[in-house]
Amino acid sequence: MTSFFKLKKLIFLSAALLAASSSAMAEEPNPIGDWWIIYGNGVPQKNIMYVADATSVVPSQKTKGATMDAVTLVYEEPGKPMNDVYNLEAQCSTGKVRFINGQSIERLAYTMRHLKVANQWQTPKEFWVQQALKFACAPGSRAKNDMAAVGKMEYLQMIEMLQQMFFKLAPIQQKSQMMDNIDSLLELKK
């Protein structure tokens, strides 16, 4: 099996796992997501984009009163996986989340592995998890919460688009980093 077909099969499996929280989406052969960037770390050559799918925000069938949310982490760094996918439950009234499951797709081997997740209810500490909670609980405030709509597309298209974004960001981030380094050397920065 060629690498491209292996990748496409694994991306499809990952998308299916991501869609497992939404039965309507899971029935589609190539589900279309409504993608939003909820956070990005902005580290040159090590960018990570945290992308949530609005179609995954549905009432949980597992926990009464909770809302499901799926977040994909797309990595730029070659030594990292291509992406990780986490399915979370959010309790909007208490401001708590818990991880249901997670999967990772390795960049070169195109293999999928299951990630260990802490499945107890917790107050989010990491910023991206806080953003995931806001994404699920305040859909009308996504733009106000510094989230950017990416558009409606298939999962593989979203991954490819973000990889292209990393490619376009690289020279801009390198120039910015170079200017910061020069400022530091000249002690112009306070």
Question: Where in the sequence are the language-model features?
Answer:
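N-terminal secretory-pathway/extracellular module detecting exported/lumenal segments
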Residues: 26-87, 91-190
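N-terminal signal peptide c-region/cleavage motif recognized by signal peptidases
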Residues: 19-23
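Cleavable N-terminal signal peptides
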Residues: 13-14, 24
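Bacterial N-terminal signal peptides that target proteins for export
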Residues: 2-11
